[in-house]
Amino acid sequence: MTAPIRPQPGILDIALYQGGASKIAGHADPLKLSSNENPFGPSPAAVQAMADAVASSHRYPNTDHADLRAAISEIHGLEADNIICGVGSDEVIHFLCQCYAGPGDEVLYTQHGFGMYPIAAKAAGATPVQVAEDARHVDVDALIAGITPATRLIFIANPSNPCATMIDNGEITRLADALPDQCLLILDGAYVEFADGYDGGKNLVEARDNVVMTRTFSKVYGLGGLRVGYGYGPRHVIDTLNRIRGPFNLSGMALAGAEAAVRDVDWVNECLRVNADERARLVGGLRQLGLACDDSHANFVLARFASEAAADAADAHLKRDGIIVRAPKSYGLPDCLRITVGRPEDNSRVLASLTALVAA
């Protein structure tokens, strides 16, 4: 009798990732504020570029992503040869774990960190190690204390998701200074465009050989449905990651749309301007209702309620009004709701709904 087919150790320990909901029973067209998407969608230039690319769908895309990497390099001042493009920054995170962590190795991430970090670590056979945060902020001292001889990777999202908090460059540098030789620091910059005065780790990456940053086109660029992201790091790391990257991991449409999106600086700047104004209005309105909110450095707000029951009641009330937000219980925040900053009229609906709940 042959042995049963079994997956690799650790695979069945992976909890399925739960994305933001998009449907509510009884509401044909709900307001979705659960996935931190750009409410204005992609740049019109990106939409046109994708439409133009459809006619070439019978052709394989370029394998080196040279045009997209050149556009990223030009707009963001990065070295094109130090960029790797992936199917969202998620794929780059998986590449890093596959290449640099395995059985017997540890991958550190923070208490309320992005759920993909432990998934990618377990998929590579490594052990994810959660490190406590300090009032929903990355705690550098706790991370340094958590480093062991088995530590290979440290992931921090800055700004963080789902908390929207961030630490400054001085704290990030202090963490990088404390890394042992065998350890890589990965700065997840999915929301970095929304954080004023922060380079996402660019200067730190370029000054060291053990720091990598990741970025995505899913947030400010409004291309979550295309799945495009990239990593920026030392040449030796990027060359290693490219060895396991599929040659055609990005479609021709994705490459065309992402290149046009990154080049449409005016569209991006206008989206950022509206987000900053509306974020401040949303935070102010929530605080006036007695809800605690940390200052947000992203395109969403984490509202804290008096209890888990109060958060559940607010979530249910918003759903009855046709509004979907994210209840981040799986992130250890049962008394919170994460609310994407929407269009002005969207945010007005949220505040009106919660005002009615408080007044009831």
Curated annotation (Swiss-Prot):
Where, per the database record, does this protein carry N6-(pyridoxal phosphate)lysine? Answer: 219
Q: Which GO terms describe its molecular function?
A: histidinol-phosphate transaminase activity; pyridoxal phosphate binding
| Record keyword Lipid metabolism present | no
Q: What class of enzyme is it?
A: transferase
In which pathway does this enzyme or protein participate?
Answer: Amino-acid biosynthesis; L-histidine biosynthesis; L-histidine from 5-phospho-alpha-D-ribose 1-diphosphate: step 7/9
Q: Which SUPFAM superfamilies match?
A: PLP-dependent transferases
> Which cofactors must be present for this protein to function?
pyridoxal 5'-phosphate
For whether the record's keyword set contains DNA-binding, the answer is no
**Record's keyword terms, sorted:** Amino-acid biosynthesis, Aminotransferase, Histidine biosynthesis, Pyridoxal phosphate, Transferase
Query: What quaternary arrangement does the UniProt entry report?
Result: Homodimer.
Family, per entry: Belongs to the class-II pyridoxal-phosphate-dependent aminotransferase family. Histidinol-phosphate aminotransferase subfamily.
- Give the NCBIfam families listed for this entry: hisC (TIGR01141)
Q: What is this protein called?
A: Histidinol-phosphate aminotransferase
Q: Whose protein is this, by species?
A: Jannaschia sp. (strain CCS1)
Q: Which gene encodes it?
A: hisC
